[in-house]
Curated annotation (Swiss-Prot):
Compartment(s): Cytoplasm
One GO cellular component term: cytosol
Species: Clostridium botulinum (strain Kyoto / Type A2)
Family named by the database record: Belongs to the RimP family.
Domain of life: Bacteria
Biological process according to GO: ribosomal small subunit assembly; translation
Chief location: cytoplasm
Record function comment: Required for maturation of 30S ribosomal subunits.
HAMAP family: RimP (MF_01077)
CDD domains: YlxS_C
Listed name of the protein: Ribosome maturation factor RimP
InterPro entries in the record: Ribosome_maturation_RimP, RimP_C, RimP_C_sf, RimP_N, RimP_N_sf
Key words of the record: Cytoplasm, Ribosome biogenesis
């Protein structure tokens, strides 16, 4: 099974578990770091994510994973909040954070810059518009390597 298929299959099964515990499934990734594999589950909630909440979701997901055994290799399960400087992966994430400050990292420079910071104004399937100082800058999505919420306390 490909990594993409694995993630999609896990999303379908983990999402109802997270929702049943009053959390949103924000993102899933399966990564290798050094010699170790990690299944990382990011959860979110309107009320924030506590350590106890992560533990509760982790136990429920762990039971599911023990039952369905979707990953043949050994791995560590990690459940956490996406954090204040969270990556915005989907249109749903972009919609939620319209009018917030974001950081766009680019694959290659546009106007000699590989990083743009500004207020998320709008987006569509092809572009993201951000307000930088008083100017609207339109960046093609294909040029963006990562979109991150600019965490501000």
């Amino acid at each position: 099974m490909s990594k993409h298929s694995l993630i999609e299959n896990l999303k379908k099964q983990i999402e109802p578990i997270a929702e049943g515990l009053d959390y949103e499934l924000y993102h899933i990734e399966f990564v290798k770091e050094g010699k170790e594999n990690y299944l990382r589950i990011y959860i979110d909630s309107e009320n924030g994510v506590s350590l106890e909440g992560c533990e509760k979701v982790s136990r429920a997901i762990s039971e599911l994973l023990d039952d369905i055994d979707p990953i043949q290799e050994s791995y560590y399960l990690e459940v956490s909040s996406p954090g204040i400087d969270r990556v915005l992966y989907t249109d749903k994430h972009l919609e939620k954070y319209k009018s917030y400050n974001i950081v766009l990292n680019l694959y290659s420079p546009i106007d000699k810059k590989k990083k743009y910071e500004g207020e998320l104004v709008d987006f569509n399937e092809n572009e993201i518009d951000i307000k930088v100082e008083e100017n609207i800058v339109t960046i093609p999505r294909e040029k963006i390597s990562k979109t991150t919420l600019k965490g501000e306390l």
